């Protein structure tokens, strides 16, 4: 998940309030009656929130706290696409190989539509409470517990994204260096060891960037990252028509009657021990919810309807891009595809593959500090330590980077990152949190019975996802060797 300018930092959004919606004066179900300039709602408990939804809010010119957005609809679509797009795209071909084309298409379509619905719920909750910060929204509805839960889910999601990015560095940088040195892929030395390289990159490049007080130009690297992923998609499609299907040598995992036709024939529905990773990987690839409200707050002439249009366009574009990457990656390597699709391409004597590999490496290295800023800012905000302190800033940064590096070094495969984060934080952010917030906010609204039923079913789906996927992922770990890619 590549964030829109890291989202905005939480401290920058504290004073943002929700603007007048398209039908704010016509839909009697959207807001409770205004009496003496104050909303009668149990969620409006402090002065800041009361001001955001009172008569003074309805009169934009008199509201000092209202900050009009300046971002066009097109640029907002681009920003949200940046927030959606991330390393998850590299694991989709692996997900397709372990589900089959038809089942994968059903899962991808379902998660796309459900993600759009969850954003709709999130926008309704933001409108009803006047909160434009995800943690603040959780605190308004569920108190301190809600704030901590949302902080935990967003931080785990961002940490998972950072882990996947550094895992790309660990996987891809050695191959790029070997190519530039003119060495074979089998060449071995400490300076082409991915574990050593990821530590060098982290503390030589990423740490200095993370120590900066402000994001600065780093907030705009997501555009470069999205461009790199589009370039990657183009290369994947092009290489499909260049790379022949290769039958692996017979071994203990491949029966003696394997044929070229069997190996190079696409499967439409399939089930195996790795099928469980498909849905978490797809969910991981579509999470952008922490960035939705910051993007909404900067949308010009913003309204719920307009932001919903932004999300619809963005998700449709990402759906097309994800499906094309998955299908062409799968049709290139079939059952031999890995959980990191880029790693399957050999850069030996191939400048194009080297170029896309280097582009992706640079993109993820520059994106890690953006995500890191979000996690650290949320941590300081939660601890009420918003005033800058150089010593604390440095110590927390170093500790977090050390922990992240240890995880990257010892995690055997990207599918493990997608699996864990997908069934936990991605599930929370897409299914459980938006539906829970909506059900709580509309608890006493008898006019929204049908919508509440759908939200309750959505919540149940998220809980079922967790109850089924988490045990299956753990079971696969118990039954598989740490280096098994499932082939």
From Swiss-Prot:
Record key words, sorted: Amino-acid transport, Cell membrane, Disulfide bond, Glycoprotein, Ion transport, Membrane, Phosphoprotein, Sodium, Sodium transport, Symport, Transmembrane, Transmembrane helix, Transport
Coiled-coil ranges per UniProt: none
Modified residues (Phosphoserine): 6, 25, 28, 49, 52, 56
InterPro entries: AA_transpt_TM (IPR013057)
A molecular function (GO) term: L-amino acid transmembrane transporter activity
TM ranges: 75-97, 113-133, 148-168, 189-211, 217-237, 276-296, 313-333, 351-371, 394-414, 417-437, 453-473
Cellular component GO terms held in the UniProt record: axon; basolateral plasma membrane; external side of apical plasma membrane; extracellular exosome; membrane; neuronal cell body; plasma membrane
Notes on how activity is controlled: Inhibited by alpha-(methylamino)isobutyric acid (MeAIB). Inhibited by lithium, potassium, choline ions, N-methylglucamine. The pH dependence has an allosteric effect on the transport.
Positions of post-translational Phosphothreonine modification: 11, 54
Topological domains annotated Cytoplasmic: 1-74, 134-147, 212-216, 297-312, 372-393, 438-452
Segments on the Extracellular face: 98-112, 169-188, 238-275, 334-350, 415-416, 474-487
Compartments, as annotated in UniProt: Cell membrane
Catalytic activities: L-glutamine(in) + Na(+)(in) = L-glutamine(out) + Na(+)(out); L-alanine(in) + Na(+)(in) = L-alanine(out) + Na(+)(out); L-asparagine(in) + Na(+)(in) = L-asparagine(out) + Na(+)(out); L-histidine(in) + Na(+)(in) = L-histidine(out) + Na(+)(out)
Induction text: Down-regulated by bacterial lipopolysaccharides (LPS) in glial cells. Down-regulated upon hypoxia.
Keyword Oxidoreductase carried by entry: no
Biological processes per GO annotation: amino acid import; amino acid transmembrane transport; amino acid transport; female pregnancy; gamma-aminobutyric acid biosynthetic process; glutamine transport; L-alpha-amino acid transmembrane transport; L-glutamine import across plasma membrane
Pfam families: Aa_trans (PF01490)
Disulfide partners: 245-264
Membrane topology: Multi-pass membrane protein
Glycosylation sites: 251, 257
PTM entry text: N-glycosylation plays an important role in the L-glutamine transport.
Tissue: Expressed in the cerebral cortex by pyramidal and GABAergic neurons, astrocytes and other non-neuronal cells (at protein level). Expressed in placenta, heart, lung, skeletal muscle, spleen, stomach and testis. Highly expressed in cytotrophoblast cells from term placenta.
Function of the molecule: Symporter that cotransports short-chain neutral amino acids and sodium ions from the extraccellular to the intracellular side of the cell membrane. The transport is elctrogenic, pH dependent and driven by the Na(+) electrochemical gradient. Participates in the astroglia-derived glutamine transport into GABAergic interneurons for neurotransmitter GABA de novo synthesis. May also contributes to amino acid transport in placental trophoblasts. Also regulates synaptic plasticity.
Record family assignment: Belongs to the amino acid/polyamine transporter 2 family.
UniProt name for this protein: Sodium-coupled neutral amino acid symporter 1
Provenance organism: Homo sapiens
Lineage of source species: Eukaryota, Metazoa, Chordata, Craniata, Vertebrata
